[in-house]
């Protein structure tokens, strides 16, 4: 697989985000991530998403325009699904059950007809950071990179955004994401919590109205609301 034979240092990341995260890239834990990544490549292990998409969440969502963070756990581990955006899958890929429930809630909340595509890139381009807590996974092995140190990286991003920005919306779905609430200053930002949209989760996601609540908050703080229709 040509796309995974790339040193993590060579993977493109938007310049503004690169500067924002410069200190994290120099820390011991991130050097360990790079080491683990290269070791996996040298063993010809297939990693998702493809290397050029590992930082896709940052490349599509401009730092200066960030408004909302939707936190996922780790990438899809089946072929052709992971694209570096939490919950998102490429066009023409079957929409996963959790994302189906997200679309159902959009219909309930804002009367948006469920999309035929699961590609959420249009959200990212408007300022929605679709961030997975863990940024890579071995093919067919869910949560296989959970010990690499990615959580320290994503926690640092959440905490730094909370400290340096104001008027952001953090959507925390499921207990894993809710545990990140301690990283966020709720005096400066809106924290929206709900059950995970997975059909396996207990009821509590459908009816949360997070999308309308987020847009109401954005308007309140003088920001342009998100057009949640999938383009």
Curated annotation (Swiss-Prot):
Q: Which residues form the active site?
A: 74
* Enzymatic reactions: Hydrolyzes single-stranded DNA or mismatched double-stranded DNA and polynucleotides, releasing free uracil
Query: Which EC number applies?
Result: 3.2.2.27
InterPro entries according to UniProt? UDG_fam1 (IPR002043), Ura-DNA_Glyclase_AS (IPR018085), Uracil-DNA_glycosylase-like (IPR005122), Uracil-DNA_glycosylase-like_sf (IPR036895)
The keyword DNA repair is annotated on this UniProt entry: yes
Recorded hits in Pfam families, A to Z, give: UDG (PF03167)
Keyword annotations: Cytoplasm, DNA damage, DNA repair, Hydrolase
This protein's source sits in the domain of life called Bacteria
Q: What broad class describes the main subcellular location of this protein?
A: cytoplasm
**Any one GO MF annotation of this record:** uracil DNA N-glycosylase activity
Q: Which GO terms describe its biological process?
A: base-excision repair, AP site formation via deaminated base removal
Q: Which Gene3D superfamilies match?
A: Uracil-DNA glycosylase-like domain
Q: Where in the cell is it found?
A: Cytoplasm
CC per GO annotation:
cytoplasm
Q: What's the stated role of this polypeptide?
A: Excises uracil residues from the DNA which can arise as a result of misincorporation of dUMP residues by DNA polymerase or due to deamination of cytosine.
**Family, per entry:** Belongs to the uracil-DNA glycosylase (UDG) superfamily. UNG family.
User: Which protein is depicted?
Assistant: Uracil-DNA glycosylase
**What is the protein's species of origin?**
Campylobacter jejuni subsp. jejuni serotype O:6 (strain 81116 / NCTC 11828)
């Amino acid at each position: 697989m040509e796309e995974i034979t790339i040193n993590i240092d060579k993977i493109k990341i938007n310049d503004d985000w690169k500067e924002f995260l410069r200190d994290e890239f120099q820390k011991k834990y991130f050097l360990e991530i790079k080491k683990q990544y290269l070791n996996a490549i040298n063993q010809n292990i297939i990693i998702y998403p493809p290397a050029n998409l590992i930082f896709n969440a940052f490349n599509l969502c401009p730092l200066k325009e960030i408004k909302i963070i939707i936190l996922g756990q780790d990438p899809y581990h089946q072929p052709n699904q992971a694209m570096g955006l939490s919950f998102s899958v490429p066009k023409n890929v079957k929409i996963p059950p959790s994302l189906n429930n997200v679309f159902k809630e959009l219909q309930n909340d804002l009367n948006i007809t469920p999309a035929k595509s699961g590609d959420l890139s249009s959200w990212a381009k408007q300022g929605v950071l679709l961030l997975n807590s863990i940024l890579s996974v071995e093919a067919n092995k869910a949560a296989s990179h959970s010990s690499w140190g990615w959580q320290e990286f994503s926690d640092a991003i959440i905490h730094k955004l909370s400290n340096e920005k104001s008027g952001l919306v953090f959507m925390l779905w499921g207990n894993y994401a809710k545990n990140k609430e301690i990283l966020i200053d709720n005096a400066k930002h809106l924290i929206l919590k709900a059950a995970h949209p997975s059909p396996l989760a207990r009821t509590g996601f459908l009816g949360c109205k997070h999308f309308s609540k987020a847009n109401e908050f954005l308007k309140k703080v003088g920001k342009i609301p998100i057009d949640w229709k999938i383009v």
